[in-house]
A protein has these predicted regions:
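Amphipathic protein-protein interaction modules
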Residues: 46-104
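Aliphatic-rich, non-membrane protein domains
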Residues: 3, 21, 97-100, 104-108
Length: 119
Protein backbone atom coordinates (compact mmCIF):
# COMPACT_ATOMS: atom_id res chain seq x y z
CA UNK A 1 0.00 0.00 0.00
CA UNK A 2 1.23 3.46 -0.83
CA UNK A 3 2.38 5.57 2.10
CA UNK A 4 -0.03 8.21 0.73
CA UNK A 5 -3.07 6.01 1.47
CA UNK A 6 -4.02 4.54 4.84
CA UNK A 7 -6.99 2.63 6.19
CA UNK A 8 -7.98 3.39 9.77
CA UNK A 9 -10.77 1.64 11.64
CA UNK A 10 -12.39 1.60 15.04
CA UNK A 11 -15.81 0.81 16.48
CA UNK A 12 -17.23 3.98 14.86
CA UNK A 13 -16.30 3.08 11.29
CA UNK A 14 -13.64 2.74 8.64
CA UNK A 15 -11.73 5.64 7.13
CA UNK A 16 -9.59 5.71 3.99
CA UNK A 17 -7.15 8.64 4.17
CA UNK A 18 -5.34 9.92 1.09
CA UNK A 19 -2.57 12.46 1.79
CA UNK A 20 -2.59 14.67 -1.28
CA UNK A 21 0.34 16.78 -0.05
CA UNK A 22 2.93 14.05 -0.66
CA UNK A 23 5.50 15.06 -3.30
CA UNK A 24 4.49 12.30 -5.74
CA UNK A 25 0.80 13.19 -5.46
CA UNK A 26 1.53 16.89 -5.90
CA UNK A 27 3.50 16.12 -9.09
CA UNK A 28 0.60 14.06 -10.46
CA UNK A 29 -1.77 16.88 -9.55
CA UNK A 30 0.38 19.40 -11.41
CA UNK A 31 0.31 17.23 -14.53
CA UNK A 32 -3.45 16.84 -14.19
CA UNK A 33 -3.79 20.62 -14.01
CA UNK A 34 -1.59 20.99 -17.10
CA UNK A 35 -3.91 18.64 -19.01
CA UNK A 36 -7.18 20.05 -17.64
CA UNK A 37 -6.95 23.68 -16.51
CA UNK A 38 -9.92 23.36 -14.12
CA UNK A 39 -8.32 20.39 -12.37
CA UNK A 40 -6.50 22.23 -9.59
CA UNK A 41 -5.97 19.19 -7.41
CA UNK A 42 -7.02 20.17 -3.92
CA UNK A 43 -8.99 17.77 -1.75
CA UNK A 44 -12.30 18.77 -3.33
CA UNK A 45 -11.10 18.09 -6.88
CA UNK A 46 -9.53 14.76 -5.87
CA UNK A 47 -12.96 13.87 -4.46
CA UNK A 48 -14.62 14.92 -7.73
CA UNK A 49 -12.12 12.95 -9.83
CA UNK A 50 -12.37 9.83 -7.65
CA UNK A 51 -16.18 9.98 -7.66
CA UNK A 52 -16.08 10.13 -11.48
CA UNK A 53 -13.50 7.33 -11.73
CA UNK A 54 -15.26 5.06 -9.25
CA UNK A 55 -18.65 5.55 -10.91
CA UNK A 56 -17.08 4.30 -14.14
CA UNK A 57 -14.74 1.55 -12.91
CA UNK A 58 -15.74 0.48 -9.38
CA UNK A 59 -19.29 1.68 -8.61
CA UNK A 60 -19.73 -0.83 -5.79
CA UNK A 61 -17.13 1.10 -3.77
CA UNK A 62 -19.40 4.17 -3.76
CA UNK A 63 -22.25 2.36 -1.97
CA UNK A 64 -22.34 3.54 1.64
CA UNK A 65 -19.31 5.82 1.19
CA UNK A 66 -19.19 9.35 2.54
CA UNK A 67 -16.29 11.70 1.81
CA UNK A 68 -14.69 14.68 3.51
CA UNK A 69 -12.20 16.40 1.22
CA UNK A 70 -9.91 19.02 2.75
CA UNK A 71 -7.17 21.22 1.33
CA UNK A 72 -4.44 18.63 1.92
CA UNK A 73 -6.38 15.43 2.53
CA UNK A 74 -9.10 13.30 0.99
CA UNK A 75 -10.97 11.02 3.38
CA UNK A 76 -13.69 8.46 2.71
CA UNK A 77 -15.80 6.92 5.45
CA UNK A 78 -17.72 3.68 5.73
CA UNK A 79 -19.71 2.00 8.48
CA UNK A 80 -17.85 -0.67 10.40
CA UNK A 81 -19.00 -3.86 8.64
CA UNK A 82 -17.15 -6.65 6.85
CA UNK A 83 -18.65 -5.48 3.54
CA UNK A 84 -17.47 -1.93 4.18
CA UNK A 85 -14.02 -3.16 5.12
CA UNK A 86 -13.78 -4.86 1.71
CA UNK A 87 -14.92 -1.64 0.00
CA UNK A 88 -12.36 0.42 1.93
CA UNK A 89 -9.59 -1.98 0.92
CA UNK A 90 -10.68 -1.79 -2.71
CA UNK A 91 -10.83 2.04 -2.59
CA UNK A 92 -7.32 2.17 -1.13
CA UNK A 93 -6.11 -0.25 -3.82
CA UNK A 94 -7.73 1.85 -6.58
CA UNK A 95 -6.10 5.06 -5.32
CA UNK A 96 -2.74 3.31 -4.95
CA UNK A 97 -2.98 1.86 -8.45
CA UNK A 98 -3.78 5.28 -9.91
CA UNK A 99 -0.76 6.76 -8.12
CA UNK A 100 1.47 3.95 -9.41
CA UNK A 101 0.05 4.33 -12.95
CA UNK A 102 -0.79 8.02 -13.35
CA UNK A 103 -0.97 7.62 -17.12
CA UNK A 104 -4.47 6.20 -16.50
CA UNK A 105 -5.46 9.46 -14.80
CA UNK A 106 -3.99 11.49 -17.65
CA UNK A 107 -5.80 9.37 -20.24
CA UNK A 108 -9.13 9.93 -18.53
CA UNK A 109 -8.51 13.67 -18.33
CA UNK A 110 -7.60 13.85 -22.01
CA UNK A 111 -10.66 11.83 -23.03
CA UNK A 112 -13.28 13.04 -20.54
CA UNK A 113 -11.85 15.96 -18.57
CA UNK A 114 -14.52 18.33 -19.87
CA UNK A 115 -17.26 15.98 -18.64
CA UNK A 116 -16.04 16.20 -15.05
CA UNK A 117 -17.63 19.00 -13.02
CA UNK A 118 -14.57 20.41 -11.27
CA UNK A 119 -14.74 22.60 -8.16
Amino acid sequence: MSNCVQILSDENGIQVCFDIQQEKVMAIGEEMNAIQEEAYMNGENWDIFLQYYLAEYAPEVLVGMETDPEAGMYAAYYDSTPESEAKAKKLAAVITSLLEHPEEIYRILQEAGDEIEWD
